[in-house]
Amino acid sequence: MEFGVAMFFTDYAMDAGEFAQAAEQRGFDSVWAPEHSHIPTSRLSPFPTGGDLPKKYAECMDPFVSLTLAAAMTKTIKLGTGVCLVVQRDPIQTAKLVASLDQVSRGRFLFGIGGGWNAEEMADHGTSDFKGRWKLVRERVEAMKAIWTQDVAEYHGSLVDFGPMHARPKPAQRPHPPVIVGGAFPYGARRAIAYGQGWVPHGSRPQYGDVGQFLPEFQKMAREAGRDPADIPVTLFGIPADLDRLRYYRDAGVARVVVSLDSAPADKIVPRMEKWAELRRRLAE
């Protein structure tokens, strides 16, 4: 089981490039950058984990900028959006961002995507149909795949529609970077099986259940859909610093766990990263 590390990159947190270097040096396989464009002051949508919304949600940098810096300062570590809010982004421009980052990183990008939870934030981007947002996500992903894989690309859906176009660069990874779909079981799992190359559930939200218990059913669902479960690896966010729990996830079939660290300077982040690296080493014994 691989270990990744995530942070809301802000102007008061550890630099994204230095963060990625430190993670690469300590054996983490991936760095992840979340996304929120802004937080409306009139927000009514509840924070999924309860309580007050941490200020870093309104203050994080654009994930593609952070990951480009991380790419420039590292050689092997993978670079993921954790997650990109596709409902708030133009698919043509986002397809170019993804392909460009995959090229400058020499094929290290992981395209984590999600539907989001903040209805007011989405509405400011013109996405007012909160309940129907996943249909928009799917069409935008399908449209981006067309742009990445076709010399002359076009897409005609009910929500996304464009005629033949030339769009380069194409991604370094072929046919494209893995699209890793976020969401709880069973709906997120079904979406990952339908159009993803990975699934990202969350481990610290008890209302969504125990991911480890769902994995046999997830694998069965994948096979019934004609897909090899190995082609849809599970990346789990929201994990405890508990060796027994990590063993449980590993033995259940989780491919990667991602550690979320606070938005803080290097003198606070590096020691925490060291502790997680030690847990990773102990797990491998």
What kind of region is each of these model predictions?
Residues M1-E285:
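Active-site-adjacent structural elements that line small-molecule/cofactor binding pockets in enzymes
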